[in-house]
Amino acid sequence: MLPRKVFFTKGVGRHTDPLVSFELALRDAGIEKFNLVTVSSIYPPYCEIVEAEKGLSELFPGQIVFCVMSRMTSNEQGKRIFASVGAAIPPDPSLNGYLTEYHGYCNGEDAGRHAEESAAYMLKTAFEIEPARTFNITVEADVEDCTTVVAAAVFVI
């Protein structure tokens, strides 16, 4: 199973119950209808990056869907949390790239940049090449009740 496409999405959910908070974050990201299976950090060769709407149009409710997901849940009122997925795409499409997850409490650091740089480092050290492109998808939120943030790279097989 080699994914043909990938899209990136993010969401925030708030509720008094952590599980419901997570569900609401998935809804906000548009991926609540799928049975999500998290995988590790490889961006597949020849994988096309598409807009979320296009990727979602090829998926069906209840489908098992693979993704790289960063997730953070907290009930520490007054804190700010983040979730980020960074990507490093190789110049040669026959090579794999890297996706990295990073999450935690905001501390002034550029979380998205950190995830992006981690992915770039993995690509550089795996193939001794510079990435053709790096980017990230990051979500931040102030904690109210129980808050969950999710960022995901979602694969379409």
UniProtKB/Swiss-Prot annotation:
SUPFAM superfamilies, A to Z: Pyruvoyl-dependent histidine and arginine decarboxylases
Pfam family, one: PvlArgDC
Residues marked Cleavage (non-hydrolytic) (site): 40-41
InterPro entries: Pyr-dep_his/arg-deCO2ase, Pyr-dep_his/arg-deCO2ase_sand, Pyruvoyl-dep_arg_deCO2ase
Catalytic activity: L-arginine + H(+) = agmatine + CO2
Any GO BP: arginine catabolic process
Residues with PTM Pyruvic acid (Ser): 41
Family per record: Belongs to the PdaD family.
Protein name: Pyruvoyl-dependent arginine decarboxylase 1
Gene name of the encoded protein: pdaD1
